[in-house]
Amino acid sequence: MPREIITLQVGQCGNQIGSEFWKQLCKEHGINAAGYLEEFAKPGIDRKDVFFYQSDDDHYVPRALLLDLEPRVIDSIKTSEYSGLYNQENIFVAEKGTGAGNNWANGYKQGESFYDDIFDMIDREADGSESLEGFLLTHSISGGTGSGMGSYILERLNDRFPKKIIQTYSVFPDDSSVVVQQYNSVLTLKRLIENADSTVVLDNNALHRIVGENLRIDQPTMDQTNSLVSTVMSASTTTLRYPGYMNNDLVGMLASLIPTPKCHFLITGYTPLSIDRQTESVRKTSVLDVMRRLLQPQNIMVSAPTKTGKYISILNIIQGDVDPTQIHNSLQRIREKRMATFIDWGPASIQIALSKKSPYIKSSHKVSGLMLANHTSVNHLFSHIIQQYDKVRKKQAFLANYTRESGEILQEFDIAREMLDDLVQEYKAAEQSDYINYHMNKEFNNNNNNNNGNPQYQYGTV
């Protein structure tokens, strides 16, 4: 029985990377732009039904909702060659189409006003699933719609589907001149901490660096970075779509990666990525080569000092025809060379999931790999966001845009900032051997001081 996953694409960024994701899945499953199987595609060798369903005319339709407050990106999808792929009833654009103006509070408020429209679509899609496992959300944490409306949807999803997995692919901002992105990021991260079971961190700075280095260009385009993101997304779901003996569902995949609920922010690495023909012609990919490269900082898609922190967990998804003996020998070599430093309080091991490559895509590499890792150095990314937030908050820059939407937003800022700082301390504590005791002591102190602390506050109501 399939464990279906519904994808929610929210905002400009969420729909752009979601669109690339579906193009990639169509290629890997032998599905054309209209949703029909190609003549060369063979039925029964994969599990398309995790992400697609078949309509009455037998064409494959993504289990996806396309949601935005302004029409530009969705209009481009509707006029592309893939326009016939999607269920038009699962596309929502706000009637006025003015967007959220890079304002989290505005996006949240509009999401609240469109609650019935959005969740009627979600409920219809969920009811059409035989055994729904969860939701996959693509969005940016720094804009207005992906952050604000995305936050609102996260909260309501958690309320309405408490037993379903929620995984997000969240794009973190680069160091741009958009001042308010720090406000939006802090408010969104609070919702990701509280409501997501797993968040795959997609750091714009690192994505641009990796694409630039591999393509040898100074200014990568948005399409090029989105293509990289779609590669990561498709690789991270390959064991669900081409199942083996392990990691056939999200629960199994996340169980070993996230030993403590709060530390659920995952970093990624992928190799080989080079499209330079000269490099491809001389490189010999092996399991050891792939696993070694996955641990190298230049291949990790987060701007964080991974050499100074510790791994809480690693799952390597290896694609290709691989002899299990090669896996064993590679793991032994990595241990001998001490290529990865693990926390002291958990199993110091790299989990391996073997997956088939799509038979419909030609590859010049025999072996490729994706690393999903829980690493304590991700706290540096959160610390940087806090530092940038504190600077603009001290100047009270553009705060009026937020207080205009809600008089309670300043209190919400303070709570969100405190929660993000707690997450930073949590990851730092995870580097220590007495982390379990630290966690117990913290809970004990919180219980004793409960009457003196701030009450939990949830922004907005249904």
UniProtKB/Swiss-Prot annotation:
Q: Name one GO molecular function term.
A: GTP binding
Pfam families in alphabetical order = Tubulin, Tubulin_C
Which InterPro entries has this protein been placed in?
Gamma_tubulin, Tub_FtsZ_C, Tubulin, Tubulin/FtsZ-like_C, Tubulin/FtsZ_2-layer-sand-dom, Tubulin/FtsZ_GTPase_sf, Tubulin_C, Tubulin_CS
Question: What are the transmembrane regions?
Answer: none
The processes (GO biological process) annotated in the record are: cytoplasmic microtubule organization; meiotic spindle organization; microtubule nucleation; mitotic cell cycle; mitotic sister chromatid segregation; mitotic spindle organization
Q: Where does GTP bind?
A: 142-148
Highest taxon of source: Eukaryota
Biological role stated in the UniProt entry:
Tubulin is the major constituent of microtubules. The gamma chain is found at microtubule organizing centers (MTOC) such as the spindle poles or the centrosome, suggesting that it is involved in the minus-end nucleation of microtubule assembly.
Q: What is this protein called?
A: Tubulin gamma chain
Recorded source organism is Dictyostelium discoideum (Social amoeba)
Give the classification, highest ranks.
Eukaryota, Amoebozoa, Evosea, Eumycetozoa, Dictyostelia
Q: Which gene encodes it?
A: tubC
